[in-house]
């Protein structure tokens, strides 16, 4: 577990806390129902807490990077490694975010992770979307946190858009100097794992990266697609 402390307490007085778990379930803070705004004079609870956890950094080879991923934190989140900020504050409780912490780590030594969380967002639009709702409001790290070792050049983010006729578009953002690298996209059957061929009778399509700072768009058309549907579900 990690240690946890409310902002109005000293870190030395922190208590052991399990995660992933919203902090109300462990006796910190209080629940407020999401329709608090319908009650005159009512305000939602807005605690701030700090998680502290010591860990050893994973081994890496030359050029590899270490990233820390948060699958879900409610709500505004600041991350510090050995007392230094990992990046800008993340706002929004329902989606994953990450930081490259390679240069902040002490290889072979204990490293300190501190996560400062404000239950209520400083962003009004986020509060309107996430906190004015028909559910209980909560705070804390409620989804898993993990480290990943990645190559110096890797995919940072991608979006796939496939239609029932076999057309596929892949929008890919790269991390690192990827100029001259080649991206390859292939499609396999869920039933037997075999390659599905394009209309040009190729098992994959390739894309040469000319500018790694730009989004890479890869497009292709595949034959004999059997799209999943409720009428014709494909079980794996």
Provide a role label for each language-model segment:
Residues 61-64, 105-110, 217-235:
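Short glycine/proline/serine/threonine-rich loop/turn segments at secondary-structure transition edges
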Residues 1, 22, 41-42, 46-157, ...:
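Accessory beta-strand-rich segments of carbohydrate-active enzymes
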Residues 94-98, 215, 226-227:
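Short, surface-exposed beta-strand/beta-hairpin micro-motifs centered on an aromatic residue
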Residues 1-28:
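Predominantly extracellular/luminal regions of secreted and cell-surface proteins
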Residues 2-4, 198-199, 232-236:
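Short, intrinsically disordered, charge-balanced linker/junction segments flanking boundaries
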Residues 160-166:
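Short, solvent-exposed loop/linker segments at the N-terminal edge
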Residues 81, 167-203, 207:
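Beta-strand-rich binding/interaction modules
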Residues 200-224:
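Intrinsically disordered, low-complexity Pro/Gly/Ser/Thr-rich segments with frequent PxxP/GP/PP motifs
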